[in-house]
């Protein structure tokens, strides 16, 4: 628990060996790391790489706080393991609950969104970095920290929900998800996550 903040997450796997993951990691100076990632491809190999990446991140964040540097260190350490596997898309936010500031770095993952207390998107954070494991040389562009006003909502995700397809080949879409969050913005974080899950399941029907 973080004083003044309500945080929740979930994975909606396509199989029991999903490559998606999330984590909340204690970082330096009483900040918290918010991690969302996806291993390209699925299967037991992807699940093992996901576990390895999580372990690396928890080790790196003991001595590094800048999200860009953290992801660079992750690439350095896990790149040899990914040569024959694929790559990982990862977004990492560093929340300072005292300053209400969110620093962010993105290695090929879906953008993060900041919604205000009225549920309107006031910022879409795109840093445009390449996924972890594609190249040995790795660098991310910086982004300005986001200041979180009272009632703000920060949304981290992979492409799984917006690109989920139903039996009619229609995508769930990011706008549908953001609209759903806006409608339920007064609910708790865990309730919002559950509502999104229910809507995605209902939307998919007999699709994938």
Per-range role (PLM):
Residues 1-155, 198-208:
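… and, occasionally, acidic/histidine-rich disordered N-termini of signaling adaptors
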Residues 46, 50, 64-67, 170, ...:
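Short, charged, low-complexity patches
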Residues 58, 75, 178-185:
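Regular secondary-structure segments
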Residues 151, 175, 182-208:
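Non-catalytic regulatory/interaction regions at protein termini and inter-domain linkers
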Residues 161:
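Conserved short acidic donor-positioning loop in nucleotide-sugar-dependent glycosyltransferases
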Residues 164:
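ABC-family ATPase nucleotide-binding domain "signature/switch" substructure
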């Amino acid at each position: 628990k973080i004083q003044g903040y309500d945080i929740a997450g979930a994975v909606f796997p396509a199989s029991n060996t999903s490559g998606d993951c999330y984590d909340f990691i204690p970082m330096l100076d009483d900040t918290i790391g918010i991690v969302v990632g996806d291993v390209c491809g699925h299967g037991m190999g992807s699940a093992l790489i996901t576990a390895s990446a999580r372990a690396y991140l928890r080790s790196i964040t003991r001595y590094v706080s800048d999200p860009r540097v953290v992801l660079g260190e992750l690439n350095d350490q896990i790149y040899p393991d990914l040569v024959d596997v694929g790559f990982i898309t990862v977004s990492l936010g560093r929340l300072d609950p005292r300053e209400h500031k969110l620093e962010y770095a993105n290695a090929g993952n879906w953008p993060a969104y900041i919604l205000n207390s009225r549920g309107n998107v006031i910022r879409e954070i795109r840093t445009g970095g390449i996924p972890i494991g594609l190249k040995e040389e790795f660098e991310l562009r910086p982004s300005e920290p986001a200041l979180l006003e009272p009632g703000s909502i920060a949304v981290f995700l992979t492409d799984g929900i917006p690109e989920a397809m139903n039996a009619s080949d229609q995508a769930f879409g990011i706008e549908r998800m953001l609209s759903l969050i806006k409608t339920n913005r007064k609910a708790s974080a865990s309730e919002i996550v559950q509502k999104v899950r229910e809507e995605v399941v209902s939307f998919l029907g007999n699709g994938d």
